[in-house]
Each structure stands twice: as structure tokens, then as C-alpha cells.
Amino acid sequence: MNNSFKIIAKATSVFSFAFIFMACQNTEVNTEKMEDIELEEQDVEAPQSDVDLSVTYQVPTPNELFTLFSDVEVAFDANLLNSTSNTEKYSSNKIKALNFGVYSTDLAFAANFGEATASLKYFSVIKNLGDELNVNNAFDQLVFDRIEQNIQANNSDSLFNLSNETYYNAYTYLKDNDRGSTLSLIVVGGWVESLYILTNLVDYEVDKELLSRIADQRLTLENLYGFMAEYQSDSDVSEIMASLLPIEEVLMNLESEESSIETGVNDNGTYNLDGGADFFMSQDEFNSLKEAVNALRNSIVESEI
């Protein structure tokens, strides 16, 4: 491996983002199955809700990676977001679903930084796309009113939670109505946009924590493939799976070392799970990943895929 140092990422198993997604929704964690889960070191809030734990979401959410920004010095950059005027280019359901995911990530990014005006603008865009995709239940007037109220109160935490709630509602509706193909496209669009924002924000020499999370996306990609496999008979899904191959080539060739798993509960009531595989990313690999992500993301937002 070349270049001056290695970026290490504690790897998650295929259930890592399932666990994170449930944590974002304040659901409980099934401790009986905890020994089967390999998670990177992070604090996850202890269970407080009575939500059914039998539901497993094996896909990433747009919000999860952006929570790291509170711990590192990263500035909001509106130029990284997909222009809302691009919606005029989106005519097919495939491209609408992909960009629904893109805009959901942009909403999460803006909300994380407390960008109230941008949050409202991107919520309006995904509401309109949701209507066109028949995902109406995720965007009732009550949610819209709550977003406006939080913008007026400059409440960035609630904006972030509402952006997550919107995505969750759309996810649940599509899953419950056997629209996994559309959901697959939304998830891929959101994940690609998250990687695009991250790889264009970080400095390889400085932002080691964010870089480790980027390297960790190898496991997330495996998780995505597993989720989409059920729907690959749909030509739109099989095509987007093929378009991920350049990203897969970089991530799957990262070096790794195995480490033991340790679990526990901290004094503040949060779960701490550490271990799994350690991934290493060189600067050349980071540059190759960034190039592959940029190419796919631009083809999505420009409706060229």
C-alpha cells in the first residue's frame, strides 16, 4: 500500500446500519442477538421506546454519517447539494427515486448544520418528488408545519430529527407496500450523495475520523447489495447495481485486519460496541473512490444514468 499513512476503519457487519437505523428512531436493541453483531466503536443511545424490535432495517440512513460533523471542524457547503432546479430533468420513476434519495441526504446535511431555509427548500422538493412517486403518507401537512415551526425557532436538532422521520416514513411505506424496487433506488441515491458530500468535504491529511467512516462504507455497500438482491429482477435495480461496480472495486480492495468484539454499556446508559475488522485506506485509494463516487453521483443528478 502506498503513501504516507493508513486510514483505519472499524468495520461493521451487514447488520451495522440496521442497528444504527433503529437507534436513530429510538427503538430498543435486542441484546440476546448482540453477540451476532459486529459494530464499530461508537456510542448508541440505550433503549427507551416500546417500538417493536423484530423489525430490522438493513439499509443506511442519510443522517447517520452526518452526525460525525459535531465532533470535527467541517463547514456547511451549499455548493455540494443537488440544485433544486434539476427536478425539471427528472421524468422517469427511476431517476425520480434516485434523486429522492439524493435530496433526502441534502435535507439531512442542511438540517444537521441548522440551515433552516435550505432545509425547508429541500423538504419541499422531496415532498413533490414523493407525490410523483406516490409516497404521499411521508409528507403530511403536520410534518410540514412542524418543520416551519422549527425553522422559525431556529431549532436545528428538531430539524435533523424531522428529516430522519421523513425518510423513515417513506422507507416504511414503500417496504409495507411491496415497493422494494423503488426503495432500493432511493437508498442508493441517498448513500451515493452521502459519500459524495463526505469525499468532497474531507482532507485526507487532516480528517482521519471522517476518513475512517468512509473506509467503513465497504460493509455498507455489502449491506446494500444484500438488500437490493431481492429486487434485481427489476431492470432499474440491476442497472444501478452495475453502476456501483467502480465504487465496489475500490472499497472491496481495501486491506483489513481482524480484531475481537467487545460490548458494554457506559455510565451514561449508551451502548459501546467495539471490534470487527480494521480497514486501511491509502490516499491513492481515497482519490480513486472520490473519482468513482463523483462520476456516479453526477450521472444521477444530471439524469444521465
Whereabouts are the PLM-identified features?
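A cross-kingdom marker for long, charged
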Residues: 227, 232-305
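Non-transmembrane, amphipathic alpha-helical segments
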Residues: 88, 92-95, 107-114, 118, ...
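N-terminal Sec/ER secretory leader and immediately downstream segment
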Residues: 33-147
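Extended amphipathic alpha-helical interaction segments
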Residues: 156-241
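C-terminal motif of bacterial Sec signal peptides marking the signal peptidase cleavage site
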Residues: 20-23
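Bacterial signal peptide processing site
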Residues: 25-28
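Bacterial N-terminal signal peptides that target proteins for export
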Residues: 2-13
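Secondary-structure edge/capping motif, primarily at the C-terminal ends of alpha-helices
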Residues: 107-114, 133, 137, 174-177, ...
